[in-house]
């Protein structure tokens, strides 16, 4: 396909036009008084949101050159979302500011490669200063503040803090759509997996249709059990002790299942059989997790164990095992705590090493099941449009909270970025030429989030920026209450990871765009028209001949 090429200033200005169209759409959402953006959907109701990355993903521009610029900034938002889960609007705004100031200097004759060097030098200094002033968070109140600022809703912040308090920092917290109007928190303690009983005759509570066993033995195996003779020796040992049994196996069928059910109905022996969760290698890993949690040994031929020779000391135990039609929950397994910690560390290492998002998600689930439990935030609203918007805000707030727990917090409302300006200015003395220009570009860009938050609230951004710069570190502008306060004491905070990622990703893409000297796009070709339809069939000539 033929290409069209633009060079120099013309190419850069076309890219900048696309950057501005995307950034101007996104930046109106910044801050507590930021507005929403409505996005048309081909199917269903329009989406109303203030989530930067969601808005950016929807933008495709007609002009190919402008679209390239927009796609580059979209990458800033997407990368920040992937790394920190929030701060995408800030990242987009910083990218726009760096590109605007940078292109002015390139047009005036500055060398973009040297400017790029200055930009990276300044960003490194700013990030180092952010890390130095970062405060770690431990208390439930601090976690609630981070969530409340991100979602602009104190109730959401409190809900997330409650969830983290119950399942721990490594616990899984998921966000789901509720069928009711309210937003609620459901917590599942212990390990739960999505496999229920193999026969409804095994239930102990016929009203709730669930089997609840306290202090029962747990047999874990990767074998398919179809012959009762295989497990008869171990069953006899358990019956002698008068204990109940939970069997977790690849499958239990035929004679084996029928015998267990008949014995349960006769009152001879209480047992519930459950299929092992997962598939393939993931099933093996989950069986190992269950074994570690309950203190059992996985009875597997791969490990040299056979069901016929299994003994009671190979079985695990737990305070409670609850099995319903679809789920099995093991609470307070009696496994060795050190072995559980080692298993948790092993899974954390796998999470760090994996590149697959799907694998990462499944490993996170396993980690949560071993280390605490799962919390589900059920999001409710009056209409579907409000429900989608609220769900996106809660997901962002949850990501921001996790980031804050990981790397700590800094002053919010754009204050932290203004506070690191002196560290960037300190580099100016030892720099010269275009490298100095690159440092000054970052120095100016660091003001932009605070300026935009003020302007979205209908205030003069420059006045607010100058006042914050002349105040003590940590003093910022509380837009909602129209006063200057110590941001951290007032609970207006941002996660360090979010602020750092936004700046690093914005600088990375923007500096690359400044070094562009030509842009190449496909020439839009006219699509050939559809061929004409077939001619109509002629009518039948003459009438029927007379007999």
Swiss-Prot record:
- Please indicate if the UniProt record lists Cytoplasm as a keyword: yes
Q: What is its main location?
A: cytoplasm
The catalytic activity, as recorded, is: ATP + H2O + a folded polypeptide = ADP + phosphate + an unfolded polypeptide
Q: Name one GO biological process term.
A: protein refolding
Q: Which InterPro entries has this protein been placed in?
A: Chaperonin_Cpn60_CS, Cpn60/GroEL, Cpn60/GroEL/TCP-1, GroEL-like_apical_dom_sf, GROEL-like_equatorial_sf, TCP-1-like_intermed_sf
Task: Show the Pfam families listed in the entry.
Answer: Cpn60_TCP1
Tell me which UniProt keywords the record has, alphabetically: ATP-binding, Chaperone, Cytoplasm, Isomerase, Nucleotide-binding
State its Enzyme Commission number(s).
Answer: 5.6.1.7
Q: What are its GO cellular component terms?
A: cytoplasm
Q: Which residues are ATP-binding? A: 29-32, 86-90, 413, 478-480, 494
Please list the GO terms describing molecular function: ATP binding; ATP-dependent protein folding chaperone; isomerase activity; unfolded protein binding
Gene3D superfamilies noted in UniProt: GroEL, GroEL-like equatorial domain, TCP-1-like chaperonin intermediate domain
Compartment(s) where it occurs, according to its Swiss-Prot or TrEMBL record: Cytoplasm
Q: How does it assemble?
A: Forms a cylinder of 14 subunits composed of two heptameric rings stacked back-to-back. Interacts with the co-chaperonin GroES.
Q: What is its biological role?
A: Together with its co-chaperonin GroES, plays an essential role in assisting protein folding. The GroEL-GroES system forms a nano-cage that allows encapsulation of the non-native substrate proteins and provides a physical environment optimized to promote and accelerate protein folding.
Family, per the entry? Belongs to the chaperonin (HSP60) family.
Protein name, per record = Chaperonin GroEL
Species source reads Alkaliphilus metalliredigens (strain QYMF)
């Amino acid at each position: 396909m033929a290409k069209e090429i633009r060079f120099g200033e013309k190419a850069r200005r076309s890219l900048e036009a696309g950057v501005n169209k995307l950034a101007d759409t996104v930046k109106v959402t910044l801050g507590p008084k930021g507005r929403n953006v409505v996005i048309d959907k081909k199917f269903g109701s329009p989406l109303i949101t203030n989530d930067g990355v969601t808005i950016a993903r929807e933008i495709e521009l007609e002009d190919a050159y402008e679209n390239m610029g927009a796609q580059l900034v979209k990458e800033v938002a997407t990368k920040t979302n992937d790394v920190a889960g929030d701060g995408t609007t800030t990242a987009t705004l910083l990218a726009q500011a760096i590109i605007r100031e940078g292109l002015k200097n390139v047009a005036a004759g500055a060398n973009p490669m040297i400017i790029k060097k200055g930009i990276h030098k300044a960003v490194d200094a700013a990030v180092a200063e952010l890390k130095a002033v970062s405060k770690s968070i431990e208390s439930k109140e601090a976690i609630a503040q981070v969530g409340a600022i991100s979602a602009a809703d104190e109730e959401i912040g409190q809900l997330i803090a409650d969830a983290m308090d119950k399942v721990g920092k490594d616990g899984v917290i998921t966000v789901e759509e509720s069928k009711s109007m309210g937003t609620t928190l459901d917590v599942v303690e212990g390990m739960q997996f999505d496999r229920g009983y193999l026969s409804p005759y095994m239930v102990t509570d016929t009203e709730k249709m669930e089997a609840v066993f306290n202090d029962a033995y747990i047999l874990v195996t990767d074998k398919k059990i179809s012959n009762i003779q295989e497990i008869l020796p171990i069953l006899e040992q358990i019956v002698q002790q008068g204990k109940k049994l939970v069997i977790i196996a690849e499958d239990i069928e035929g004679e084996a299942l029928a015998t267990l059910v008949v014995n349960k109905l006769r009152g001879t022996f209480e047992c519930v059989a459950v299929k092992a969760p997962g598939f393939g290698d993931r099933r093996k890993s989950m069986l190992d997790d269950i074994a570690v949690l309950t203190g059992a040994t996985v009875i597997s031929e791969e490990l040299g164990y056979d069901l016929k020779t299994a003994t009671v000391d190979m079985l695990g135990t737990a305070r409670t095992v609850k099995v319903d039609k679809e789920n099995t929950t093991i609470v307070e397994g009696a496994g060795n705590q050190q072995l559980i910690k080692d298993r948790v560390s092993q899974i954390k290492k796998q999470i760090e090493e994996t590149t697959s998002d799907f694998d990462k998600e499944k490993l996170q689930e396993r980690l949560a099941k071993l280390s605490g439990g799962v919390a589900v935030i059920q999001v409710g609203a009056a209409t579907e449009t409000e429900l989608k918007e609220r769900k996106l805000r809660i997901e962002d707030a949850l990501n921001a909270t996790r980031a804050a727990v990981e790397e700590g917090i800094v002053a919010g409302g754009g204050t932290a970025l203004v506070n690191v300006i002196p560290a960037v200015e300190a580099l100016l003395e030892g720099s010269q030429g275009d490298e100095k220009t690159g440092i000054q570009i970052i120095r100016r860009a660091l003001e932009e989030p605070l300026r935009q938050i003020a302007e979205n609230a209908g205030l003069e951004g420059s006045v607010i920026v100058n006042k914050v710069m002349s105040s003590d570190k940590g003093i910022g502008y509380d837009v909602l209450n129209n006063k200057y306060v110590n941001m951290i004491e007032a609970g207006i905070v941002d996660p360090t990871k979010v602020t750092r990622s936004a700046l690093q990703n914005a600088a990375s893409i923007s500096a690359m765009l400044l070094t562009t000297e030509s842009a190449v796009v496909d020439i839009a070709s006219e699509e050939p028209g559809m061929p004409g339809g077939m001619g109509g069939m002629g009518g039948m000539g003459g009438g029927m001949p007379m007999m």
